[in-house]
Amino acid sequence: MNSLSEANTKFMFDLFQQFRKSKENNIFYSPISITSALGMVLLGAKDNTAQQIKKVLHFDQVTENTTGKAATYHVDRSGNVHHQFQKLLTEFNKSTDAYELKIANKLFGEKTYLFLQEYLDAIKKFYQTSVESVDFANAPEESRKKINSWVESQTNEKIKNLIPEGNIGSNTTLVLVNAIYFKGQWEKKFNKEDTKEEKFWPNKNTYKSIQMMRQYTSFHFASLEDVQAKVLEIPYKGKDLSMIVLLPNEIDGLQKLEEKLTAEKLMEWTSLQNMRETRVDLHLPRFKVEESYDLKDTLRTMGMVDIFNGDADLSGMTGSRGLVLSGVLHKAFVEVTEEGAEAAAATAVVGFGSSPTSTNEEFHCNHPFLFFIRQNKTNSILFYGRFSSP
C-alpha cells in the first residue's frame, strides 16, 4: 500500500467495524476529517505514542520511507504522510463553481504551554492550520464556547455544540478540532415533482413512510452477485465528487453485506473498472442524518492507548512531556435532497428525478443501505455512513 487514501479507507473500515458493535441504526462520520486531525497530533508525537497512532491509522503502510524519526517535521521525502496531507488538503480546498468543500483544522492549547516554533511551522505547512492559545485553566466554559463557535463558522452553522457542556475542565491542556463542510449539486438533479411518499423497510416486519426521490437515467452500476448486493455511483456536478450507494438485494441483507465487507473489497467493488454505464430506475430517500461520537474509547480499543494517559509523549509540540489528549469528539451531518447534498464538521447528503417507462436496472433504496461520498481524483472517502432508520 502506498497512498494516504488507501490508509484512510482501511482506517474508515476499522472504525466502521467498531461502530457496528454498538450502533444498530444510522452511522455517519468523516474518516478523512478524523485522520487529518490525528495526523496533526502525530506530527508532535514521539516514540511509542507515535508508533501507536501510525499503526491505527495505517500510516505505517504508506510508502517505505514514510517516516524517519517519529516526530517528523524535517520531512522532505514526497512519500511522507504529512506531505501527502498537504497535497490532499490543497486539492480539497480548491475553489470551484461545482461544489463547496472545505476542511478546517485547529489546535486549541492551554495558554501556559508554549508550543515549539518548529511544530507551529510544520502544522501550518502541512495542515494549513495554527494553534490557538486559550485559558482552559481559568475559563474552561468560555474556552468551550469559543471552540464551538469556531466549528459552527467553519461548517456553515451545520455543526453546533460539538463539545457538550462538561467536556472541558480546568485541567484540559489540548483540544484538537477538525471541521469538514461539503455542499454539492447532483450532476443530474432529481425532479421534485417525481418525489413521492413511499415505504421504507428498516426490517421485514415494519415500514415507515418517507419522501422518496426518483430518477431514471444512466449511472455507473455493478451487481455484486457474491454478496447479493448492488452498487451505484451518483455523481455531483463536475464529477469530481460522487456518492456511492451499496444496496443489499434483500430487505434484511445489510448485516450479511457488512459481515463480508473488507476495505479491499470496498475499493474493488466501487472502482470504475468494475462498474458499467447502465440505465437505472433510481429511488433514493430524501434524508438527513446527524451523528456524534466521542472516539476516545474506540481509538483506545483499536490500539491508540498512550496518547490519552500519562504515557503520552507529545514533546514534539512543546519540547517537554505533560500534554495529554483528553478526547477526540466528532460530529457529522448529512442531508440529501433533490438538488444534491449538504454535509458538515464531518458530513454528507443526497438527491432524486424523472419517471421511467421501461428500465434496465432497478435501484430502490427502500431498505437499509451503506453510502459514502468520495473525491474521485484522489480516491479519498470524505464521508461514510449507514442509513437504516429514517
Swiss-Prot record:
The record marks S354, S355 as: Reactive bond. Changing A341R: Loss of inhibitory activity. One of its GO terms (biological process) is positive regulation of epithelial to mesenchymal transition. InterPro entries: Serpin_CS (IPR023795), Serpin_dom (IPR023796), Serpin_fam (IPR000215), Serpin_sf (IPR036186), Serpin_sf_1 (IPR042178), Serpin_sf_2 (IPR042185). Pfam families: Serpin (PF00079). One of its GO terms (molecular function) is cysteine-type endopeptidase inhibitor activity. Coiled coil: none annotated. Gene3D superfamilies: Alpha-1-antitrypsin, domain 1 (2.30.39.10), Antithrombin, subunit I, domain 2 (3.30.497.10). The keyword tRNA-binding does not apply. Keywords: Acetylation, Cytoplasm, Protease inhibitor, Serine protease inhibitor. CDD domains: serpinB3_B4_SCCA1_2 (cd19563). Disulfide bonds: none annotated. It comes from the Eukaryota. It is found in: Cytoplasm. GO terms for cellular component: azurophil granule lumen; cytoplasm; cytoplasmic vesicle; cytosol; extracellular exosome; extracellular region; extracellular space; nucleus. The modification N-acetylmethionine is found at M1. Interacts with MAPK8/JNK1. This is Serpin B3. The lineage of its organism: Eukaryota, Metazoa, Chordata, Craniata, Vertebrata.
